[in-house]
């Protein structure tokens, strides 16, 4: 039976009961968990993609001009990403992780804030990659961004020193294949949990938006925490339409 929390307090109390009763909790996070940390949303009105049209993967690979523009945009955002620190939502999930309730987090975010909050790298399933380092699109060789920046300042967007294919941020661009291993791990986790908490996601980007449904079909209870309604509110057991930091803040340190 779906419950839309009438106020923040009742929502937090019900969420606390569900967390206490759960054995295995899988959080699924979207952009909303990071906006209080200063990371701008990409998709919402006024977001980055409304100001700069996304560069698709095939365009990046085919055009030096597109690669230069992609890296110019990334370095223009460097201060924002470098200054960001985990918010209350990240820290609350890390507390549940340390307590053994959360085996891993599934995220659509690329900002590395779950790792910064205390999650081991191998326990953060990044569906859309990570913008804090770079990877060759050919052989997969990884590079630190300071190396890319030095090359970029000298000669524009660099190619791989191993195979001479283009180097891009280790994120998933439009038209690029989703990471198979991460999708498989996210599927297994969604099917194995007894509480799935979707946080700060509009739940419209597929295939990632399928994980809450998958967990629900497998018998898990579903919580959705998002300021705006989502298309999956009707199947949720609890919907909390309040600030994420305020909602999850009471669970920091528990």
Swiss-Prot record:
The UniProt record lists the Deacetylase sirtuin-type domain at 5-254
Task: Please provide the record's keywords in A-Z order.
Answer: Cytoplasm, Metal-binding, NAD, Transferase, Zinc
Task: List localization entries.
Answer: Cytoplasm
Q: Does the keyword Zinc apply?
A: yes
Task: Give the Gene Ontology MF terms in alphabetical order.
Answer: histone deacetylase activity, NAD-dependent; NAD+ binding; zinc ion binding
EC number(s) for this protein? 2.3.1.286
GO CC terms of this entry: cytoplasm
Cofactor: how and how many bound: Binds 1 zinc ion per subunit.
Binding residue positions for nicotinamide: 42, 110-111
Lineage, top-rank taxon, reads Bacteria
- Active site: which residues? 128
Please provide an example of a Pfam family that matches this protein in its UniProt record. Answer: SIR2
* Required cofactor names: Zn(2+)
Which amino acids does the record list as binding Zn(2+)? 136, 139, 160, 163
Q: Which reaction does it catalyse?
A: N(6)-acetyl-L-lysyl-[protein] + NAD(+) + H2O = 2''-O-acetyl-ADP-D-ribose + nicotinamide + L-lysyl-[protein]
Q: What is its main location?
A: cytoplasm
* Sequence positions that bind NAD(+): 31, 35, 42-43, 108, 110-111, 128, 201-202, 226, 243-244
SUPFAM superfamilies referenced in this protein's UniProt entry, alphabetically: DHS-like NAD/FAD-binding domain (SSF52467)
Briefly state the protein's biological role. NAD-dependent protein deacetylase which modulates the activities of several enzymes which are inactive in their acetylated form.
**Entry-linked HAMAP family:** Sirtuin_ClassU
Family as reported in the entry's similarity comment: Belongs to the sirtuin family. Class U subfamily.
**Entries under PANTHER family matching the protein:** NAD-DEPENDENT PROTEIN DEACYLASE, NAD-DEPENDENT PROTEIN DEACYLASE SIRTUIN-5, MITOCHONDRIAL-RELATED
Q: What is this protein called?
A: NAD-dependent protein deacetylase 1
Q: Which organism is it from?
A: Bradyrhizobium diazoefficiens (strain JCM 10833 / BCRC 13528 / IAM 13628 / NBRC 14792 / USDA 110)
């Amino acid at each position: 039976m779906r419950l839309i929390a009438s106020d923040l307090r009742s929502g937090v109390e019900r969420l606390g009961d569900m967390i206490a009763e759960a054995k295995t909790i899988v959080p699924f996070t979207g952009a909303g968990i990071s906006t209080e940390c200063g990371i701008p949303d990409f998709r919402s009105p006024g977001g980055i993609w409304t100001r700069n049209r996304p560069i698709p993967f095939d365009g990046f690979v085919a055009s030096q001009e597109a690669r230069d523009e992609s890296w110019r945009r990334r370095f223009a955002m460097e201060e924002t990403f470098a200054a960001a620190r985990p918010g209350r939502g990240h820290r609350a999930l890390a507390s549940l992780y340390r307590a053994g309730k959360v085996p891993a987090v599934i995220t659509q975010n690329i900002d590395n804030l779950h790792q910064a909050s205390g999650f081991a790298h191998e326990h953060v399933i990044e569906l859309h990659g990570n913008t804090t380092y770079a990877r060759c699109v050919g052989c997969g060789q990884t590079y630190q961004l300071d190396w890319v920046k030095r090359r970029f300042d000298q000669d524009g967007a660099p190619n791989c020193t191993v195979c001479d294919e283009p180097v891009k941020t280790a994120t998933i661009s439009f038209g690029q294949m989703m990471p198979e291993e991460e999708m498989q791990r996210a599927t297994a986790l969604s099917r194995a949990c007894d509480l799935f908490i979707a946080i700060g996601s509009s739940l419209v980007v597929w295939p990632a938006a399928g994980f809450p449904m998958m967990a629900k079909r497998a018998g898990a209870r579903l919580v959705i925490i998002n300021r705006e309604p989502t298309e999956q509110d009707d199947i949720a057991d609890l919907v909390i339409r309040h600030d994420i930091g305020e909602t999850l803040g009471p669970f920091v340190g528990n």
